[in-house]
């Protein structure tokens, strides 16, 4: 029976350290500030943004939410980002994704000044991460790495299998574990025999958005399973892993909700504090 990794608890203890850091910066007359831009009325995005605001307030950080209507022009958004780039009181800029179809996501990410890119999506941040240079790391991958380390799971020399290749989680999380000397395999929708791959994993990270994709027979006994999926099925949140069955095989597993999610926001706060220094 697996140990269920309590992401809320790990996040909470990390946030206490961040709170002390904010207090120390305030003594130096620095008030860390995160500005979030939300376009449109997407319910999931609204909920994420509320979570970010609440977490920022809890540690004493300033958080500013700019709401824009769905029909906002791309040029207007880019102009706003330009203004925030030039505003010395703003340390972190986050544009909540996904964006309306008429706005080019890449253009928007590229427009954010790299020194304020607290999401870690700018090509400068991604490039630095690739070569192992200090930079803003993407929040969910960094949260996963922190969780695994916090549970004292050895990483160097272990086989990490990542299911999913998104720019936000899949690709970067593999790179972070590679930088920690793990052997990393990527799987995706075109992988021929997914189960044959996942059964080799000492650490299995699943981030595809397909409910219960990973079943117990696809998991190596005593593996550590990190479920990044968030899917709504019959009004309930479930991950990409068949939790109850896999729990019987794995040594550790993250639940959904309450696993990776709280760490994502915590790493966003961490990045904003680093940007303020």
Swiss-Prot record:
Description of how the protein assembles with itself and partners: Homodimer.
Q: What is its EC number?
A: 1.5.1.5, 3.5.4.9
> What residues does NADP(+) bind to?
164-166, 189, 230
What's a GO cellular component annotated to this UniProt protein? cytosol
According to UniProt, the name of this protein is: Bifunctional protein FolD
| Catalysed reaction, written as an equation | (6R)-5,10-methylene-5,6,7,8-tetrahydrofolate + NADP(+) = (6R)-5,10-methenyltetrahydrofolate + NADPH; (6R)-5,10-methenyltetrahydrofolate + H2O = (6R)-10-formyltetrahydrofolate + H(+)
Record pathway: One-carbon metabolism; tetrahydrofolate interconversion
What functional role does this protein have? Catalyzes the oxidation of 5,10-methylenetetrahydrofolate to 5,10-methenyltetrahydrofolate and then the hydrolysis of 5,10-methenyltetrahydrofolate to 10-formyltetrahydrofolate.
The similarity comment for this entry is:
Belongs to the tetrahydrofolate dehydrogenase/cyclohydrolase family.
Q: Per UniProt, which keywords does this protein have?
A: Amino-acid biosynthesis, Histidine biosynthesis, Hydrolase, Methionine biosynthesis, Multifunctional enzyme, NADP, One-carbon metabolism, Oxidoreductase, Purine biosynthesis
* PANTHER family for the chain: C-1-TETRAHYDROFOLATE SYNTHASE, CYTOPLASMIC, C-1-TETRAHYDROFOLATE SYNTHASE, CYTOPLASMIC-RELATED
One GO term under biological process is: tetrahydrofolate interconversion
- Single annotated GO MF: methenyltetrahydrofolate cyclohydrolase activity
Organism of provenance: Exiguobacterium sibiricum (strain DSM 17290 / CCUG 55495 / CIP 109462 / JCM 13490 / 255-15)
Q: Which Pfam families match?
A: THF_DHG_CYH (PF00763), THF_DHG_CYH_C (PF02882)
């Amino acid at each position: 029976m697996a140990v269920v990794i309590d992401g809320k608890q790990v996040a909470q203890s990390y946030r206490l350290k961040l709170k002390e850091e904010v207090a120390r910066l305030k003594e130096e007359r620095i008030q860390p500030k995160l500005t979030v831009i939300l376009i449109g009325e997407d319910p999931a995005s609204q909920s994420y943004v509320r979570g970010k605001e609440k977490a920022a307030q809890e540690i004493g950080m300033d958080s500013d939410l700019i709401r824009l209507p769905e029909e906002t022009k791309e040029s207007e958004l880019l102009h706003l980002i330009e203004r925030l780039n030039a505003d010395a009181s703003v340390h972190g800029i986050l544009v909540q994704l996904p964006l309306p179809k008429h706005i080019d996501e890449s253009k928007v990410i590229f427009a954010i000044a790299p020194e304020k890119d607290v999401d870690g999506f700018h090509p400068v941040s991604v490039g630095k991460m690739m070569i192992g240079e200090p930079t803003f790391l993407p929040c969910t991958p960094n949260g996963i790495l922190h969780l695994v380390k916090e549970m004292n799971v050895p990483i160097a020399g272990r086989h990490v299998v990542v299911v999913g290749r998104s720019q936000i989680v899949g690709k970067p999380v593999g790179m972070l574990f590679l930088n920690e000397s793990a052997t990393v395999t990527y799987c995706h929708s075109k992988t021929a025999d997914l189960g044959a791959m996942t059964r080799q994993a000492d650490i299995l990270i699943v981030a595809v958005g397909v409910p219960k994709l990973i079943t117990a027979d696809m998991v190596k006994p005593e593996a550590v399973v990190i479920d990044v999926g968030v899917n709504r099925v019959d009004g309930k949140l479930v991950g990409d892993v068949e939790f109850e069955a896999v729990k019987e095989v794995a040594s550790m597993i993250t639940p959904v909700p309450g696993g990776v999610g709280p760490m994502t926001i915590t790493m966003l706060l961490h990045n904003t504090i680093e940007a303020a220094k």
